[in-house]
Amino acid sequence: MSGFGWNQQSGPIAPVLIYPAAGVLLMGLCITFVVETIMGGINTGLNNALTGMGNSSKVILGLVLGGMMAIDMGGPFNKAAYVFGTAAIAAGNNDRMAAVMVGGMTPPCAIALASLLFKDKFTKEEREAGPTNFIMGLAFITEGAIPFAASDPVHVLPSCIVGSAAAGAISMFFNCTLMAPHGGIFVFPVVGNAMMYLVALVVGTLISAILLGVLKKKVA
């Protein structure tokens, strides 16, 4: 009887209290013991690989860091590169952070430029939103490119990755440095070799914008 009574009483509250609480608990356990373990291992592996790469070729490291910033634009690869860059600042390797930031600035700037140069490759809504990405890119907000990448990942992501990788490699080649972990153009006064850093951003942006114009299909 007590079991029956409990079922009758819990019936109305189960959908609004018990089920959500159980779902949150299960999700928390899954994230803690499965997702965090897997992602922690991946991040550790990436960090070790990047550290080892830094001992062999700075330009290749810059290329990889820049490309990682555009692979998922705010996802695990992007964040792994960013964390590596910020940790490098503490270690006195300011050139790593410079490559990371210029790689993250490139995708939004490239999409903004491409939406102006190749209007037939973007929808009306994308053309209207495109110029806003100049501001986001210059402020080092890579996520501004996400809607464009989500709508056409096959063509947008490779274009952005190539340009970001080129920007990161150029930054490292000219020994550009950055002591700030964020800020975009607002921290250019503390960038070492700022002129070539700007060149890296412009070249990376042009490469990605041109690739977007070539690879993207015309909007019907």
Please report, for each region that a protein language model flagged, where it lies by residue.
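Pore-lining transmembrane helices
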Residues: M1-V219
